[in-house]
């Protein structure tokens, strides 16, 4: 699966793991992040620039799922919420860190008729 997201300067900011890199850069400028949704078994692996806003990753993940990006709540390993303006450096994310993509929990019914006081 080939996935790319281009930036203003024509460089790729989000790449799926395993894709060949066209430009030669230092490994320390990128970080590999695992994104896991609460309702799916697999983990999506993304390679992003440390200084790039994580909005690109959020938008691409949401597009793959067919849901608006702002519907998800993205959380880091320590439970901190990741906002669209954060970068991997801001959140101190390291290679292999997992980001949880959670959907809001909604209930579908009113007061219980089973327990009456």
From Swiss-Prot:
InterPro entries: Rad60/SUMO-like_dom, Ubiquitin-like_dom, Ubiquitin-like_domsf
GO cellular component assignments: cytoplasm; nucleus
Pfam family of the protein (one): Rad60-SLD
Domain Ubiquitin-like as annotated: residue spans: 31-108
Sequence ranges of Basic and acidic residues compositional bias: 10-28
Chain intervals for the UniProt region annotation (Disordered): 1-30
Cross-link (Glycyl lysine isopeptide (Gly-Lys) (interchain with K-? in acceptor proteins)): 108
Keywords, ordered alphabetically: Cytoplasm, Isopeptide bond, Nucleus, Ubl conjugation pathway
UniProt key word Ribonucleoprotein: no
Primary location class: nucleus
Subcellular location, record wording: Nucleus; Cytoplasm
Domain of life: Eukaryota
Quaternary assembly: Interacts with SAE2, SCE1, SIZ1 and MMS21 Covalently attached to a number of proteins.
Additional facts recorded: Stress conditions rapidly and substantially elevates the amount of SUMO1 and SUMO2 conjugates with a concomitant reduction in the amount of free SUMO proteins. The SUMO conjugation system plays an important function in stress protection and/or repair.
Function as written in the Swiss-Prot or TrEMBL entry: Ubiquitin-like protein which can be covalently attached to target lysines as a monomer. Does not seem to be involved in protein degradation and may function as an antagonist of ubiquitin in the degradation process.
Stated family: Belongs to the ubiquitin family. SUMO subfamily.
Name the UniProt record assigns to this protein: Putative small ubiquitin-related modifier 6
Species assigned in the record: Arabidopsis thaliana
């Amino acid at each position: 699966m080939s996935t790319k997201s281009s930036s203003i300067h024509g460089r790729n900011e989000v790449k799926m793991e395993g894709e060949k890199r066209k430009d030669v850069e230092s490994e320390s400028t990128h970080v590999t992040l695992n994104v896991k949704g609460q309702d799916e078994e697999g983990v999506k692996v993304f390679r992003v620039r440390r200084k790039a806003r994580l909005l690109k990753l959020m938008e691409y993940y949401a597009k793959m799922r067919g849901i608006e990006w702002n519907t998800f709540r993205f959380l880091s390993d320590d439970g901190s919420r990741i906002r669209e303006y954060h970068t991997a450096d801001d959140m101190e994310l390291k290679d292999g860190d997992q980001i949880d993509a959670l959907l809001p929990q909604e209930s579908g019914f009113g007061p219980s008729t089973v327990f009456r006081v």
